[in-house]
Amino acid sequence: MRSGFIAHVRFDENGEPIEHWLDDHLRDVAKLAAEFADLFGADWAHTAGIWHDLGKYNPEFQAYIRHKTGYERENAHIETAGRVDHSTAGASYAVEKLGVAGRILAYLIAGHHAGLPDWHQELGSGGALKKRLENKTHLQKATAVSIPADILAAPNLQPPALARQAENFALWVRMLFSALVDADFLDTERFMSEAKFNQRGQYQSLTHLREVFNDHMNTLAINAKPSQVNEIRADILRQCREAAEKPVGLFSLSVPTGGGKTLSSMAFALDHAVKQGMQRIIYVIPYTSIIEQTAQVFRTIFGDENVVEHHSNTDPDKAEKENAQSRLATENWDAPIIVTTSVQYFESLFAARTSRCRKLHNIANSVVVLDETQLLPPEHLKPILRVMRQLSAHYRVTQVLSTATQPALKTQLDPFGRVEREGLDDVCEIISASETLYQQLERVRLELPDDFQTSRSWEELAEELEDYERVLVIVSRRQDARDLHALMPKGTYHLSALMCAQHRSQVIDEIKRKLKTDESVRVVSTQLVEAGVDMDFPVVYRAMAGLDSIAQAAGRCNREGLLSDKGKVVVFIPPKPSRGLLGKAAESGVSMLAALAGQTLESLPPQMFTQYFDQFYNKLNTLDKAGINELLMPDNQLGDCQFRTAALKFRMIEDGDTYTVFVKFDEKAAELLATLESMGPERWLMRKLQRYTVTLYGYQFRPLL
């Protein structure tokens, strides 16, 4: 029996209003949310769905949607200041009917438009949940009318075992929130824009994509030239396929740079996902420059339609070709293969906003490949490791820690056996005898400075570098790259984040072309080339840094092992030391290598990286600088959490005193900027302009005014 209350309104081709009935909307959202939360709390998601819009039964809301708006399209769904509050009523009803357990639903329902709230006073805008629940007016008005009994029925909900552990509570609530929000968006979209809704979910299965991948790998194997490096890569691939037979859990893939991690990890992910009945593969990569490269590799294999690239710097030319389906998939990650940034992935796992949280339920029952794990931000390492433990333990997520320099992520005990640093335990290493593998892939000699306390001048280095026709120099600071580049011979390339992404992409393509044709090419770059950018130089210079950075720099030298002798990597002390985390990393690197001053090393053994990361982490005052874990631990058994404050404080990249500058780099940028001036900051436009932005610190920006 339909009660005649309206949830949303759309208009037909004649401008006549068509109603989306509230009873139908609540039941359909409940059903869909329960499906999304099948692994971790279907009954909770169902109840949240059926109560989320109880406030729309309020006669004031019905009058608003029927009369005040005149059925205006743009006002039919979005709740903003000045509109009738329709989310507090359902939250209050949950607490009234279920007591303390109802608070969990209250977080979801109260936040389903504005985002998950804090229990107590918030840092950001919006009312804290505790205060909102004290106001019973919204509930009284909504329940004063006749509502179907099945919608008001209160089930007997008991939190699952995982949610009874305090450290698991916040992620569980966020996962439920994701299921509710995505279900609400999709059901509304199904009514408001059926054509858009029907474009979703039309993907090939992972089973089919595995067949496509296997055909591609067979072709590569047939055409591969015989070499020791290719033999080693084939063995790495074999071991990845064997490890894929193991149960869901945590894995590490410790392979030296140039060992073919990208394709081997995809082989593992596909085989494992198909065997375990998983729904998607998510690649998490630290830098957008690597994402573009990796996503292109996967698109070539699987086709554009099956790979979704989700980050800010999408190429505008590709964006023109981007279909509606891939744009929609970035909203909730329902595609089979997702390639995204560490920032997007981890900030979503700690988010409060609906747009960020919406995708979370689709991380469950997936394979997540975390590329370049050594770049996990140490200031947030504790909360990141906690959420990683939970994903594998409770949400059927297999995580692969893929890097040439595995960080020290195991739980550390003090001399008395007490936990000193929580970490990841029971991690299965995919590659057997990885130390032997590192020795087999030794392709460089590492020359250390005679004295780690004495710096070299840029002038001295520039003069020395002129002797090489093909050389890459990597420094840690953008200003260092500028200073050295200014002293280098004409034609030397510069790469840093002071260039917009479009400019960097063009320069990288030009460098790669010259490397292939054996032309003279000198490059001065910041560390943005260290992780995953496929360049191969005979000589690489690296300013003193952490051991992981030195190893990554070495990965740009004699990458394919084609030199008659080994490549040459020179570590030098720059004129000015780095500050902050980079400075502490360099200090830890010096303390590890100081006893070897003046020596030439054949390799950096894997165990040295474990010791280095232990020392580096111990140098830091805290591995949870923002206190995220404390904010997300319920104060008591009542579930008092500070979701919004934690989301605001969890920032992989500190905003600080920074400014975004648009660069009129080419004709495309000029056109986009002209459109910006005439139209203002439309979302689609700002997305395209991302590739033409540079972030400046205040001290760099203010002199430009």
Where do the model's predicted regions map?
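Inter-Walker segment of RecA-like/P-loop motor cores
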Residues: G303-F350
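Interdomain hinge/linker at the junction between the two RecA-like core domains of SF2 helicases
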Residues: T405-E466
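Conserved helicase motor
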Residues: V9-F11, T288, E309-E322, V475-Q479, ...
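Accessory nucleic-acid engagement/destabilization modules that flank
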Residues: M1-H216
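Conserved Walker A/P-loop ATP-binding site and its immediately adjacent core
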Residues: L270, M278-I301, T314, A408
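C-terminal helicase lobe and adjacent C-terminal extensions/tails of nucleic-acid helicase motors
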Residues: A42, S392, E459-Y468, I474, ...
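SF2 helicase catalytic motif II
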Residues: S342-F346, R356-H394, Q399
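Walker A/P-loop
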Residues: P247-A269
